[in-house]
Structure formats: structure tokens, C-alpha cells
Amino acid sequence: MVDLLNSVMNLVAPPATMVVMAFAWPLLSFISFSERAYNSYFATENMEDKVVVITGASSAIGEQIAYEYAKRGANLVLVARREQRLRVVSNKAKQIGANHVIIIAADVIKEDDCRRFITQAVNYYGRVDHLVNTASLGHTFYFEEVSDTTVFPHLLDINFWGNVYPTYVALPYLHQTNGRIVVNASVENWLPLPRMSLYSAAKAALVNFYETLRFELNGDVGITIATHGWIGSEMSGGKFMLEEGAEMQWKEEREVPANGGPLEEFAKMIVAGACRGDAYVKFPNWYDVFLLYRVFTPNVLRWTFKLLLSTEGTRRSSLVGVGSGMPVDESSSQMKLMLEGGPPRVPASPPRYTASPPHYTASPPRYPASPPRYPASPPRFSQFNIQEL
């Protein structure tokens, strides 16, 4: 009986849904537009003297969001690992309208760090109104061509747990203020772009986590999920941040050129949408059409990417920069490491994939039982000195 019911629904539900949506879409769009217009003019949250905690605030979208909240007169708590960059952002935020700004050097993938900076924010200001999670880490490599798998945990830790931990710690205080969580997601959570497999997986987990949490909170704490395509940020160049703050840049020698969009405009849209109480902020909106293709005609996406990526030759990935404590060139919008002591360290060995030995062997184990990934020694930022600038 169940099999018969499923067979009938498989035949009836898809076309029936498309017919209903065709008739309901204009009405739903009008309702959404009317609600947005009303909230814009009559129900926008006043951020004057409100407290906003922003992770990943040292650069890119986090930095621009800090400036937008500063223009609205908010009190800011800027969190990132690069303390020097936080000082620069703090000074500018003060100049353009922020009442008070404190900076805290911390690592969002460590629960103790998250508990520390949220607690210090509450001790200093007495409340938390908005938590903005922007810390993110992207990549532009083909999964099977990666030689160093130690980057895998970093991608998932920062893109997923780097949002979950601050949210978990901040929720009790957000309940007290009926506050809001702002999430930096991406269209890659449902658009399967090549060379972004782990990033897409992490963003998909992130969006599903917050959509579920939205129902659990039942409106007591708002959630705004910001999804974007390619924007002009460090991440659009494949930037990585290693655990100790060193950065590296992957360069795919056979990648499709992609130009970033206006980062400042997206930040302005995010803050405006959060203050209106929007569930989603999308930039650009036309990316939504790809979701329809994925649901109803997934082969179209596959053919499109196959056409875009088809070329002659062998795929090759090279590591442009990696290290610890090396100077960073910030003269351009996409930060690149300036390697000390010679040219970039590009392996001169033969291609990684050969006919032998087999890619997977029974021994030794791929992941050794020791040492643990996160050493027991004190983290890089063991002191969290609140500094008002």
C-alpha cells in the first residue's frame, strides 16, 4: 500500500506543485514585497547603542559589516585572530559613527575562545543584541588533487563550527534582548560549483543548522541568512587561514575567470536586511534560478559546468604561498603571502598520481592516532585583553 501511494505521489505531486506555484507565485511575491516595504519604513530596528558582536571582523565582508553597523551608531565587539587588522577596523569604525568599539583576538573554532569573547562583551556592555558570524574559509582546488589533507578539518571547522560555537554561547544573552543572529552563508550551499566541494558541504550544513534552529527558537531570536555569489573579497581568491594565523593561497591553473561583485553593497544589504528582520538576504537574486534547475533539471547544471570547464591539458594545482609568521602583502584586495628566502615553494616532483603504488593502501593508516590535531599547549591568543579604541 505504501509503495502504491508513493508511486502515485511521484506522478502527481511534481506537476501539481508546479501548477500551484505558477498561479500562487505572483501573490506570494506581492506579499513578500509588501512585507519588506512595511518593515523598511515602519519596523526597522534602531541600532543606536545596541551591542553587535562580529566574528571575522578583520577583513572582507566582516570588516564592511562592522562599518555599516558603525554608521547606525551601534556598539561593536570585533573578533578575529589578526589583532593589528582589528585595530585598523576599530579606528575607522569609530570615525564613522560607532559609539564604542572593543577588539578581542580569538579563534572561533575553539569553544573556550568563543565563551571568553561573548562573556567579555556582556561584562563590558551588559548585553548582546546581534551576533554576526562572518568567519569563513574558501578553496579553489579539485578534491582528488589535494596533496595535503590537513586543510580539510580547517575548512569544516571554520565554516561550520566557527558559527555554531559562538551561537551556542551567545544564545542565552540573545534571548534576553530578543536579538538576532546573522549568518554568512553562500549560494554554494545548494549550487554545486566545481573546485569548492568541501566549502559547499560546510555551507550546506551551516544553512540546514540555522534553518532548523530558526524553528526551535520560534521567533524569540531572529536569524538572517546571507547568501552570496562571487563577491570581491579575500576568499574569492581562494584564501586560507591556517590555525596559527598564517595565510595561504591556492592557484588553480585551469580555472574559470570570475570577477567579484561590490563587497560594500552586499554588506549594506546584510545589515539593512537584519534590521528589517529578513530571513534571507541574497546577492545577487538571480542566482535563485539555479536552484530551480537543480531541483527539476539537474542535468542542465552538469552540462553547463562541463562546458565551462572543458579545456585541453591536465589539471594542475600549485601552492602559491604557505607559512607562519611571514609578511602579508595587503596592497591589493586579495591578500597574498610574500614568501621569504626565495621563490614560491612549488613542488618539483613528478605528478602526484601515478599508476603505482595504489592510491589507497592498507598500511600505514592515513590518519595517525597521535598527535592530536589541536595540541594541548596554550593557544596563540592566550590573553584576551579587551581594548577600547
Swiss-Prot record:
NADP(+) binds at residues 56-82, 107, 199-203. InterPro entries: NAD(P)-bd_dom_sf, Sc_DH/Rdtase_CS, SDR_fam. GO terms for cellular component: membrane. SUPFAM superfamilies: NAD(P)-binding Rossmann-fold domains (SSF51735). Pfam families: adh_short. It is a single-pass type II membrane protein. Residues 337-381 are annotated as: Disordered. The active site is at Y199 (proton acceptor). This is 11-beta-hydroxysteroid dehydrogenase-like 5. It comes from Arabidopsis thaliana. The gene is HSD5.
